[in-house]
Every structure is written in C-alpha cells, then in structure tokens.
Regions:
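Acidic, metal-coordinating catalytic cores used for nucleic-acid/nucleotide bond scission
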Residues: 255-264, 282-285, 438-439
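Short helix/loop capping segments that flank catalytic or ligand/cofactor-binding pockets
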Residues: 41-42, 120-123, 135-137, 185-188, ...
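Short, basic/hydrophobic alpha-helical segments
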Residues: 165-166, 235-252, 263
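Basic, amphipathic alpha-helical segments enriched in Lys/Arg and hydrophobic/aromatic residues
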Residues: 436-458
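Short amphipathic alpha-helical "interface-anchor" segments enriched in bulky aromatics
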Residues: 405-434
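Active-site cores of enzymes that catalyze phosphoryl transfer or operate on phosphate-rich substrates
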Residues: 118, 164-229, 350-388
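An anionic, glycine-rich sequence signature occurring as long contiguous blocks
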Residues: 224-227, 272-409, 477-526
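Dynamic "connector" segments at or just before major functional cores
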Residues: 1-177, 181-189, 211-231, 239, ...
C-alpha cells in the first residue's frame, strides 16, 4: 500500500506547472514531468512519469544539477605533509625570498617534494602536479630541462648559497659540530669527484662534503656545508670551511671528532677566538701515566642516561683534558676483545691439529717455529692491563665547563651522526649522477634545505619523547595520506584513517585551512 506523506507548507504553496507531478523520495520533494499515454489494449489513458525536473525547497524549485555535477571541477591532491612543512618552515621561505627571489617557490617546492615524496628530480614534476603546491604556486616549471638549468644557475651562485646559510645560522649557535661525509659520483664530467678513500674504505670517485651542525637557543640543525675534491682529507679542509662560514667569537664552541685533532687545528680555533671540545686518541701523550687502574682513581662521577660515568681532570696551559670511564663501554669492549681472542684461538687450534695429522702421516708442512707460533694465546694475559678500554678523553679550552657538561655536549655529536644517517639511508643522498660541478652544487643545496626540514621533524619527535614510536618515515608516509579535494573552486579536507589521526594527535599536529594558505601565497605573488 502506498504511503502518503504530509506535505509541508512550502510544497503546498508551490505552483505546480501543467503536466508535472510532485514525488516524495528519501525525505525530499521532487518535481517530475508527467505525460498521458493511451493504451489500446485497455482502451484507457495512463499517466507516466518522465525525467526529474528539480527539487522543491523552501526557496522554491532548484533545477536538476546532474549535468553540472558531471562537469564541475574535482581535484584531489596531497596536502598534509606539505601543509605542515609550509607552516613550520616560514624562516626558510623568507630567506629564500631574500636570497633567491626568482626561484624561491621552485626551491621550497623541490625541498618539500624530496622530503615527502621522492628524491629523484626526474619525478618532481609529477609529484608537484599531485600536491597542494600546484595550487599554492601554479605554473612552476619542474620538468627535466628546466630543473637542469635551475641547478646550474643555482650552483653558479655560491655567494647567495653562502649568504643564505649564514642567515639561517643567525649567530645563535653556542656549539658547532664539524664532520665530513663522502658522496660517490658516477659522473665523468665532475671535476671535484676524485678517487679517494672514505670511512668504508671505498676507493672510488667521490666528493668530500664537510658539514657544520649547530646547537643553540634556536634548536639544532645543519648550518653550513662546503664540498671539496674527494682526494682531500677532512683535516685539510676545516680551516676553509670555518672561514667561509664566518665562524668566530668566544661565544661559539667547536665540537670535533678524533679526526679533527691536530696542533694546526687547535691553533686555528684559537686564532678564530673559538672554544673547542675535541676528543683525543687513547694513545695521546697527554694521557701517558694519567689513566687510573680502576674507577676508584677517577675522583668524580655522575650519571648520564642511566649510566654511571667516572671522570678525571688533567690540567694543561689554557686547556684541560677530561678523562671519562664508561663501565658499560668497558664491558662491551672487554667482551669484544675476549670474543676475538677466542675466535683466533679456535683458528690456531684448527691449524695446529691439521699439522699434527699431517705429521702423523709423515707429510708435515710447517717448521717447528711456525708450529710453535700456533700455540694458544693466553686470553687473560693478552688482555692484561687494558686500563684505556672504556675511556674517552676530551680536550677543551672551555674552563668554565665541568666534566658532566663537557661529556653531555660531546655526546650531542649523535645529532650529526643522525643527520648523515638520514642523508644516506632515508633520502639516499650518498650518490650523485649530477653532470658538472655547478649542477652538483645546486643539488647539494637542495639536499641542505631538505635536511633542515627533516632534522626539525626529528627534533619535534624527540622532544615529545616519541622516538621509539615514530620515525621520520612514519611522519612522511602518514601525513602525505592527508588529501585535500577541490570541489567547485573550494578546498575540503578528506577523511583520514585512524592511524593518521592518532599520529597527528600524538605529535600535536593541527592542520589549518588550505584555502587560507593559497590566498596568502596569491596575495604575496609579484
């Protein structure tokens, strides 16, 4: 039986045209065409509904919009990660505008794309077209030929690159860490790619990249880089790096690694008026006769990340050496040494047994001296007085710092180690196919921008105590799932999964209006 619905006042007031009828469907009222058709079999005329004309509302008849909906513009793009990086890196956008006004949008877009999507420049244009970047800055030319020209122009302008990096540092860093990194190159036209050894003992064509990493009131991050030919070692490049970066003044302290230790480098940092915190080799003459036989002789102790650290102070002229004993490190090094000696003894025993079997058959190969050399190594005697195991010695001219502070600052070198780990593993920036030194200079600057953004995300995760929960990959892969849809000229956020929503809540990420960003960028366009 057909259900009758009570018609509201606005339907009753509606002036229904001739040859039409009103229907109630799913709680709404619609106007349909109606025709009369004669049926010859029954000899009667029957009413037949035609197409829907429109919906009847309180404002009157709203015409059918099926055709309009089919033709209206609907665009879906990545918005989450890009929107976050846009809001959190306003200083980068501002300084790019100051130093690279003609290509600031391209540079920022490429840095974001390479962090969020793909490091390969050949796919940058495709990612740009499916990102909210294409709505913020329409018409950017990121095709292959355009990017080749951009990198070369950028690489020729080392002065602007240097000015940008100096501006980013801003003089607020209290501590600067210096370290080198090697980038393999397959390019035969790259003059700075020369054969040399790196930390992995690879003797290949490579570029030596030296980096300064800052820690100060404005947070942490990569501050300055300079490339050198691959045949040049790090200790021969530090002076040029520091002078070009404009590093000087007693308010800044340089934190180096063991490769930095040399009298020339100490003279350099003192000439620049810098403080320094530099680790020494365990065989350094300064430590002769100074290493206590046990932790009792160290004089002081403190805890660091739930580990007991013992410390001894060795005074010098204008400097001091802090000698540290880490019992946990001592146990690890002792276990490693004993294991290596045991493995070596097992190998000696195998060779000794084989020789005895051959001699039993009258086929011995070794001399008596060679056989005697295969005798088992007394493990405990070989370990002997290894009092330097588990120790770290650090020289500094910062006489105002105590042992606890010096140790904590030096351990921040893990920051730059994390930087290069991200450089290699996450973004695979350790090999370059750039053709020419200008192109690789531009490529390195793009890497630098991306790494600034990445380190800021890592620091945000670390400050929240969530490094065991979220990685940089988790951040980018989840946030780039947040899309924005453009319907009839207006942007709307799409629904997100529970995992994405949980990440945003845990990291305190709240994304604002996409339209607001687009309007802001259009207003600032030249």
């Amino acid at each position: 039986m057909k259900t009758l619905h009570e018609r509201p006042d606005y339907v009753l007031r509606f002036d229904k045209p001739k040859n039409t009828e009103i229907k109630h469907i799913n709680g709404r009222w619609y106007l349909y065409e109606r025709t009369t058709v004669y049926d010859p079999e029954t000899g009667r005329s029957t009413k037949k509904s035609g197409r829907m004309i429109g919906a009847i509302t309180e404002d009157g008849l709203v015409g059918k919009r099926v055709e309009a909906r089919a033709l209206r513009e609907v665009v879906v793009v990545e918005a989450g990660a890009t929107q976050y990086l846009y809001r959190e890196n306003g200083d980068i956008r501002r300084l790019l505008g100051e130093h690279f006004p003609d290509c600031r949008r391209e540079l920022f877009s490429l840095a974001v794309i390479r962090m969020v999507q793909d490091r390969a420049l050949k796919r940058a244009e495709a990612h740009y077209e499916t990102s909210i970047l294409s709505a913020m800055w329409p018409g950017l030319r990121l095709d292959g030929p355009s990017l080749t020209g951009l990198l070369r122009r950028l690489g020729r302008d080392r002065l602007s690159i240097r000015a940008f990096m100096r501006s980013m540092a801003g003089g607020g860093d209290r501590f600067l860490m210096v370290d080198g990194h090697r980038i393999l190159s397959a390019s035969a036209t790259l003059e700075s790619a020369e054969k040399g050894y790196d930390s992995k003992r690879r003797y290949k064509r490579q570029v030596n990249l030296l980096y300064l990493f800052g820690i100060g009131g404005d947070g942490r991050g990569p501050r300055f880089y300079k490339k050198f030919p691959g045949s040049i070692t790090d200790d021969g490049t530090v002076e040029e790096l520091l002078r070009e970066a404009g590093v000087e003044g007693e308010d800044c302290t340089l934190v180096g690694d063991k490769g930095f230790y040399s009298n020339e480098n100490f003279d350099l940092v003192e000439e620049l008026g810098l403080g320094y915190i530099i680790p020494l080799d365990r065989g350094s003459k300064v430590l002769e006769g100074e290493v206590p036989p046990s932790h009792v002789g160290y004089g002081s102790a403190f805890s660091f990340r739930r580990r007991s650290i013992y410390a001894k102070r060795i005074e010098g002229e204008g400097w001091v050496v802090h000698l540290f004993l880490d019992p946990h490190l001592l146990a690890e090094e002792s276990a490693d040494l004993v294991a290596r000696l045991e493995n070596k003894n097992a190998g000696l025993d195998k060779k000794r047994r084989a020789e005895h079997k051959r001699r039993a058959k009258g086929k011995g190969r070794l001399t008596e001296a060679e056989l005697a050399a295969l005798e088992e190594i007394p493990v405990i005697e070989h370990v002997g007085d290894r009092r330097v195991m588990g120790t770290i010695a650090i020289r500094t001219n910062r006489l105002d710092l105590n042992s606890n502070q010096v140790y904590a600052i030096y351990k921040e070198r893990q920051s730059i180690e994390q930087l290069f780990k991200t450089y290699d593993c996450t973004y695979e920036f350790d090999a370059s196919y750039m053709q020419g030194d200008f192109a690789i200079e531009g490529w390195l600057f793009l890497n630098h921008l991306t790494m600034i953004m990445a380190v800021r995300v890592l620091d945000m995760i670390r400050d929240l105590g969530l490094t065991d929960v979220y990685s940089l990959d988790d951040f980018t892969q989840h946030l780039r799932k947040i899309k924005a849809s453009k319907v009839d000229g207006k942007w709307y956020p799409t629904k997100v999964t529970k995992k994405v929503q949980a990440l945003c809540e845990n990291l305190g990420i709240s994304l604002g209006s996409v339209d607001q960003i687009i309007e802001q960028e259009r207003a600032s366009a030249p």
